[in-house]
Regions:
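Short catalytic/metal-binding and nucleic-acid-binding patches
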Residues: 1-157
């Protein structure tokens, strides 16, 4: 059954999207960089505010806010579809989708919930045993907020 997404301008959402068959697509640094580049491009095109993110080997968590007229569903469709297209052109020449259909979205209703999800996202690599400290995980917004690392400044501003 297809779940309805609640697209309302200015709402803040916790988004999770999972790779097809939980394939660890994002163990590849080039795949991570490609996703970051596309996320930055579509953030600008769709007027999306990216508040936090983590790219795990087999899934991605985002906290986003739509500021424009396009839906979150359209944003995710373009992001995932074009990632698959460019991934297949550049990295792996098969034509298969890299993501499961759809995505999970949850409206964040208050600051307490936002802080809990923010913490959850940044600690996901620790929870999964990928690093001992979130500051050691490269594809996360953690360092931007806690260490003034400017690597993802364009994405997060």
């Amino acid at each position: 059954m297809h779940l309805q997404h609640y697209d309302e301008k200015n709402n803040v959402y916790f988004i999770t999207t999972v790779t097809k068959d939980r394939e660890p697509v994002f163990n590849d640094e080039l795949a991570c960089q490609l996703f970051i580049n596309l996320l930055t491009y579509y953030k600008i095109k769709y007027y999306i505010n990216i508040k936090a993110f983590v790219i795990m080997p087999d899934h991605i968590h985002l906290i986003i806010q739509s500021l424009g007229e396009q839906s979150i569903s359209d944003f995710m469709k373009m992001l995932k579809g074009n990632f698959t297209r460019y991934y297949n052109e550049i990295i792996n020449k098969n034509c298969h989708s890299k993501f499961q259909r759809g995505f999970y979205d949850k409206i964040i209703r208050n600051e307490i919930q936002l802080n809990e999800i923010f913490h959850y996202i940044h600690n996901n690599p620790v929870k999964r045993g990928l690093v001992c400290d979130p500051q050691n995980y490269h594809y996360s917004s953690y360092k931007f907020y806690y260490e003034n690392d400017s690597r993802f400044k364009l994405l997060l501003m």
